[in-house]
Amino acid sequence: MMARPVLFVLAGVNGAGKSSIGGHLLQQAGLSWFNPDTFARELMAATGCGQDEANAAAWQEGVRRFDAAMAERSHHAIETTLGGRTIPARIMAATRTHDVMVWFCGLATPELHIARVKARVRAGGHDIPEASIRARYPLAQANLIALMPQIAHLQVYDNSVEVAPGQVVPDPVLVAEMIAGSLVWPVDVDTLRATPEWAKPLLEAAISLQAGGMAASE
């Protein structure tokens, strides 16, 4: 039997650092991905259009490329907040034809996401309305939990640590990993107790999913 194509998903609310984390992993694997922020920025520079128009065009282009890759049954990589409806629904549909691998990056609070986005704006990046970030924060987790039973491989990272300017930025902390519905990290009680508050609903969902799978196999 031929191996199924893979859909790589870099997920997390704006400001989480998903591009830095997942992008590095994809580059190590020799893969590229559609980054809507980069697309929007390049479109604005090339055409002089406004931020809203560029964001809309980037979103539409991302959906177009996604749909084309799914139809062709080819490998694909995307970046998403998971805080909407359209992309999570498409990812769910893709699990029928693709092995879906998700790297989800989160921060302790919506306020920290907002602060990171503001810092990015000061460095020349584009802004995201605070209301959008606050709305996406709970939706992203809810959508991830809904996808969990169908995800082939999931890694959840905490990227909340703050450092002073000029200091070395620490690597994000792996707080959960699932492979085919089985929780493989954390592996001990002490590590489980160290789970950050924001990620506990995800761990609880993963543990519940695994327990349900074990009960069904008995």
Range-by-range predicted roles:
Residues 20-74:
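Conserved substrate/cofactor phosphate-moiety recognition/catalytic segment
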Residues 57-105, 140, 155:
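Glycine-rich phosphate-binding loop used to anchor ATP phosphates in small-molecule kinases
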Residues 17:
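Conserved glycine(s) of the Walker
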Residues 147-218:
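NTP-dependent small-molecule kinase module
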Residues 1-4, 69-70:
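Phosphate-binding P-loop
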Residues 13:
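P-loop (Walker A) phosphate-binding loop of NTP-binding proteins
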Residues 98-144:
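A glycine- and Lys/Arg-enriched "phosphate-lid" helix/loop adjacent to the NTP-binding pocket
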Residues 7-9:
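Short hydrophobic/aromatic beta-strand immediately N-terminal to the Walker A/P-loop
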